């Protein structure tokens, strides 16, 4: 499942298909010039389309608004802890090469976790994340998270770490097996808002009693249909397609 998910992520990259069409067009030009030109034009149109951010923003907005965050002033005393899903930390090589902590564009998963833990001293913090790269090696995300949370002043007695998971499905299954964790008690589930529908489905299917705490929003209200960026567009297309395809793939596989 892990390898399939990585191959699927590559297949959902708009620029991958742009390059594939362009290469196919160049190869076809020698024997079938008409086909070659059509493929080359298709690659150009796909590249231009990938910069139109309104469509992926609409897809992301639909995911992000499915689970609203808890209202201000919500009493969190009934919750025993906070499950934080990996994804907010930069690659292990950056940590080891520069001897510094490094967060990425999903950093709110980490910063909000610290904020909640500091505001609500009774909450146990459970971080779940292993090595999500095909090559493996280096510090697991849980090891990097421990360095970060320790540096932020969280007491080690309040933190638990699950370091084997590479997918959302494994996050739910492996975290439930940790000593001292009762998934039937009330937990907050913290992850990026666009990832929350899939995460909630998986955790609930695995028997967890979780309440969503979405962070890391990428959209705000109705998208502008005139917005265009060849820098942001392909990234947002990839993110939106990855989450929607992942959601339905998990549903078909019976994981949610």
Language-model region placement:
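Membrane-embedded alpha-helical segments of integral membrane proteins
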Residues: 1-29
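Hydrophobic alpha-helical segments of integral membrane proteins
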Residues: 3-8, 55, 59-63, 241-248, ...
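Extended, histidine- and acidic-residue-enriched regions that form the cofactor-binding/catalytic faces
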Residues: 15-17, 53, 254-255
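Structural signal for membrane-spanning alpha-helices in multi-pass inner-membrane proteins
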Residues: 25-29, 51, 250
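Membrane-interface helix-boundary motifs at transmembrane edges
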Residues: 29-38
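A structural signal for short, hydrophobic/glycine-enriched beta-strand patches
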Residues: 49-230
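Extracytoplasmic/luminal low-complexity segments enriched in Pro/Gly and acidic/polar residues
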Residues: 216-218, 222-228, 233-256
């Amino acid at each position: 499942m892990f390898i399939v998910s990585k191959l699927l992520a590559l297949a959902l990259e708009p620029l991958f298909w742009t390059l594939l069409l362009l290469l196919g067009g160049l190869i076809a030009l020698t024997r079938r010039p008409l086909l070659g030109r059509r493929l080359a034009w298709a690659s150009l149109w796909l590249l231009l389309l990938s910069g139109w951010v309104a469509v992926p923003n609409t897809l992301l907005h639909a995911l992000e608004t499915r689970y609203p965050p808890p209202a201000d002033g919500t009493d969190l005393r009934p919750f025993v802890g906070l499950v934080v899903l990996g994804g907010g930390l930069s690659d292990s090589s950056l940590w080891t090469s520069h001897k510094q902590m490094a967060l990425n564009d999903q950093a709110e998963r980490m910063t909000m976790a610290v904020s909640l833990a500091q505001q609500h001293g009774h909450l146990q913090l459970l971080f779940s994340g292993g090595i999500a790269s095909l090559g493996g090696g280096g510090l697991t995300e849980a090891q990097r998270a421990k360095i970060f949370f320790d540096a932020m002043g969280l007491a080690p007695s309040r933190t638990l770490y699950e370091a084997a998971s590479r997918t959302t499905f494994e996050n739910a299954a492996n975290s439930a097996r940790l000593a001292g964790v009762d998934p039937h008690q009330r937990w907050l589930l913290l992850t990026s808002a666009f990832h929350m529908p899939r995460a909630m489905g998986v955790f609930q299917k695995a028997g967890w009693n979780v309440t969503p705490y979405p962070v890391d929003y990428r959209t705000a209200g109705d998208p502008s249909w005139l917005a265009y960026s060849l820098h942001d567009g392909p990234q947002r297309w990839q993110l939106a397609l990855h989450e929607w395809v992942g959601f339905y793939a998990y549903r078909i596989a019976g994981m949610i």
